[in-house]
Regions:
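Conserved, well-structured core segments that form or line functional sites
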Residues: 1-181
Length: 181
């Protein structure tokens, strides 16, 4: 595992380009290390994007320059981890949908009661995320470290029934293939 952080210029890519590039990368925080296995892209012109209708207090981090976190509460219980991408003023982000545990099993077991990290709420719980992370630069508490490129498949996103049909059907969910590591 490469233990160096990724340069901030990496996060200047748009979310659709960056989402598959994050697959296979390592996330580290507080004794827990994970491999990113599934992501979803959210772009400014995307009706599923939280910033689609404009800036609010909740989605304000999405309007920052790429390389910060956007963490929000979903269904009143799940903390969802997003990596903000692109230039300042163009709101876009990549949702981390699933991960694989590399180290810190006892910590994750205590937090979750399970080591299953398939689902964005489970990833947030494993990392003990809360709203104080939203707007924070990567590398302060949560770091993402480089890893070789992996193969992946593209699929429609999940849980966006409210979005326009074209956005619901877009192949903007990326899943690392099992043989990639």
């Amino acid at each position: 595992m490469d233990t160096t952080g990724i340069p901030t210029s990496f996060y200047e890519h748009d979310a659709l380009s960056l989402a598959p590039m994050l697959l296979g990368k390592y996330m580290n925080m507080g004794g827990v290390s994970l491999i990113i296995r599934e992501t979803e892209a959210y772009m400014p012109n995307d009706s599923a994007c939280h910033a689609y209708k404009g800036k609010t207090n909740r989605n304000a981090p999405m309007f920052a320059k790429g390389g910060i976190l956007y963490v929000y509460l979903c269904y009143g219980i799940h903390q969802m981890l997003n990596i903000v991408t692109g230039p300042q003023g163009e709101p876009q982000a990549v949702l981390i949908r699933a991960a694989e545990l590399i180290s810190g099993a006892s910590i994750v077991q205590k937090r979750r009661g399970s080591l299953d990290l398939i689902g964005p709420g489970k990833v947030g719980q494993a990392l003990a995320l809360n709203k104080t992370f939203s707007g924070e630069k990567l590398g302060v508490r949560l770091s993402i470290c480089d890893a070789p490129e992996v193969s992946y498949t593209a699929h429609p996103r999940i849980g966006i029934g409210y979005a326009q049909k074209k956005d619901r059907e877009a192949l903007w969910r990326f899943v690392m293939t099992p043989t990639s590591l």
